[in-house]
Design a protein with these regions (language model features):
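Soluble secreted/lumenal catalytic domains
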Residues: 108-115, 166
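Flexible, glycine/charged-enriched surface loops at secondary-structure junctions
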Residues: 62-69, 91, 115-121, 168-173
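Structural motif
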Residues: 94-99, 121-123, 147-152
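Cap/lid and interdomain-hinge subdomains that line or gate substrate/regulatory clefts
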Residues: 1-102
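Redox- and metal-dependent alpha/beta enzyme cores, enriched for Fe-S-associated oxidoreductases
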Residues: 138-173
């Protein structure tokens, strides 16, 4: 629990792995999420591609939304909309199609002065951290906790890649 003063910003996109969101719809390699193998996931099947609906099903807090047209318009408009949404919503879903969109969202979140909890597959968190901490990259050993809530083939492939390249401690629950 982070406290009432935090806002969760959900950026479900990860363009580098084929995940983008347009019009509150999560696309995986151009296919709506509910039409992918995620629909048949044995542990948590997905029945909608609408990100706000998925979040609403998992939270008791009001969910706001910022569309792609606001993300690409200008940083001033995006910041204005972020602050407006934060007044009424604890959770804000934001569309992104490209890494540049994600960088723009992260820059606005950092500039907003809001306490932000990043909810995403990773690229938004990295961009937000880069904006918040603006420091040189250093080779620092850090611990990282990852939670995997899916049993899809893609998730298994990603976990195999992680095992091969990072030597993680994997705990199955």
């Amino acid at each position: 629990y982070l406290g009432e003063d935090y806002r969760a910003v959900v950026v479900a996109s990860f363009p580098g792995s084929g995940r983008t969101s347009i019009g509150d719809i999560l696309l995986v390699n151009g296919v709506p999420l509910q039409m992918t193998e995620a629909a048949n996931d044995p542990t948590s099947p997905v029945h909608t591609s609408r990100i706000t609906e998925i979040v609403k099903q998992q939270s008791r807090y009001p969910v706001g939304y910022i569309g792609l047209e606001q993300v690409v318009e200008s940083s001033g408009k995006l910041l204005e909309e972020l602050l407006k949404q934060a007044e009424e919503h604890r959770i804000i879903v934001v569309d992104a199609r490209t890494a540049r969109d994600i960088d723009a969202i992260a820059a606005c979140c950092a500039a907003s002065g809001l306490k932000i909890a990043a909810i995403d597959p990773g690229s938004f968190t990295a961009a937000l951290a880069g904006n918040l901490f603006k420091r040189k990259k250093e080779a620092i050993q850090k611990k990282l906790l990852c939670g995997i809530g899916s049993a899809s083939d893609l998730t298994r492939q990603q976990l195999q890649y992680l095992k091969k390249n990072a030597n993680p401690l994997v705990v199955r629950i």
